[in-house]
C-alpha cells in the first residue's frame, strides 16, 4: 500500500500508571475537569507505534485522521520527559501523519455547555490551533484543522449557537463537520436531556427537543450560506441579540 489510513494512534492508547489507584477512585472522568496525575500521558509508546507502522514493507505514509485529544497534548505533567514526549508527538503528528486535514472535536464554544459535556474549555482549541498553524508554517505545509461541533446539546440555547457562529467566523471557519445532538444510553448528557436536570447537581437543564427548536440552533452553523441569512437575522432579533448581526454580516 502507498498509504495506510488508520486510527491505530489516538490517545486512547494511553493507560493509567497504577490500576490500584483507579479501583479506589470515584472520579467519573480521568481527564475532566483536570487530567488525573495517575494517568500516564507519556506519548513515547504512541510514537513507537507510528514508527513501527511506517517501517512496514510497502507503507509509504501513515495518516491519523481523527481521535486526537488536544487537551492531552496541551497537558503539562510533573515529569519533564513526559512533557518532552508530548511536544515530540505533536510535531510528528502534524508534520508527518496528517493527510491534509486533521479532525478534532471541540464540540462547542460555550464553556457552560462544555461543562455538561465534560469537555475542556474552548480556549484550549485556540491554543492547539496556534500550535497547528505554527508547525505547518515551519514545515512548509498547508494543512487544515477541521473542528467538529454539536447543536441542541443539553444546556445549549440559541444564544450559545449564535455566539458559536461569531467565534468560528472570527477563526475563519466555514463549518462542515457538525451534528445535532442524539441521545445515547448511559451518558450524562442523555440523562440531562431526558429528565431536564443535571444528574450530579440536580440543576435544571434546558434541551432543544422540538423540530423548530433544533432547526433554530442548527442554522447558526451555516451563517455563511445566503439562504440562511434572513432566518438567522430574524432569530437574532427574536432572542434580543441584534449586536451579533453586525458581527456576522457587517454593518448594514
Regions found by a protein language model. Give the residues of each.
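Conserved AdoMet/S-adenosylmethionine-binding subsite of the radical SAM
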Residues: 19-181
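Short glycine-rich loop/turn motifs that provide flexible caps or phosphate-binding loops at active sites
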Residues: 8, 99, 239
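Short alpha-helical interface elements
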Residues: 2, 78-79, 118, 129, ...
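Single conserved hydrophobic/aromatic residue that forms the stacking wall/gate
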Residues: 1-9, 14
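Generic secondary-structure boundary/loop-capping signal
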Residues: 4, 90, 95, 110-114, ...
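Flexible, glycine-rich loop/tail regions that form catalytic "lids" or insertion modules at the edges
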Residues: 102, 106-108, 144-252
Amino acid at each position: 500500500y502507498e498509504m495506510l489510513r488508520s486510527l491505530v494512534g489516538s490517545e486512547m492508547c494511553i493507560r493509567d500508571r497504577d490500576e490500584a489507584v483507579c479501583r479506589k477512585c470515584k472520579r467519573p472522568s480521568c481527564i475532566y475537569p483536570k487530567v488525573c496525575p495517575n494517568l500516564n500521558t507519556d506519548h513515547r509508546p504512541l510514537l513507537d507505534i507510528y514508527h513501527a507502522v511506517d517501517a512496514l514493507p510497502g507503507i509509504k505514509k501513515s495518516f491519523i485522521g481523527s481521535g486526537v485529544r488536544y487537551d492531552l497534548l496541551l497537558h503539562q505533567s510533573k515529569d519533564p520527559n513526559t512533557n518532552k514526549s508530548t511536544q515530540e508527538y505533536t510535531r510528528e503528528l502534524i508534520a508527518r501523519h496528517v493527510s491534509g486535514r486533521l479532525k478534532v472535536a471541540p464540540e462547542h464554544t460555550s464553556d457552560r455547555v462544555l461543562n455538561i459535556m465534560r469537555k475542556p474549555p474552548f480556549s484550549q482549541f485556540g491554543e492547539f490551533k496556534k500550535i497547528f498553524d505554527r508547525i505547518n508554517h515551519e514545515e512548509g505545509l498547508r494543512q487544515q484543522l477541521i473542528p467538529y461541533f454539536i447543536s441542541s446539546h443539553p444546556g445549549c440555547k440559541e444564544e450559545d449557537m449564535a455566539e458559536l457562529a461569531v467565534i468560528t467566523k472570527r477563526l475563519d471557519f466555514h463549518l462542515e463537520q457538525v451534528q445535532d445532538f442524539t441521545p445515547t444510553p448511559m451518558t450524562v448528557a442523555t440523562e440531562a436531556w431526558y429528565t431536564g436536570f443535571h444528574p450530579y447537581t440536580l440543576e435544571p437543564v434546558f434541551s432543544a427537543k422540538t423540530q423548530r427548536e433544533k432547526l433554530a440552533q442548527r442554522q447558526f452553523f451555516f451563517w455563511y450560506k445566503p439562504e440562511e441569512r434572513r432566518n438567522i437575522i430574524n432569530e437574532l432579533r427574536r432572542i434580543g441579540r441584534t449586536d451579533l448581526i453586525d458581527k456576522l454580516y457587517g454593518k448594514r
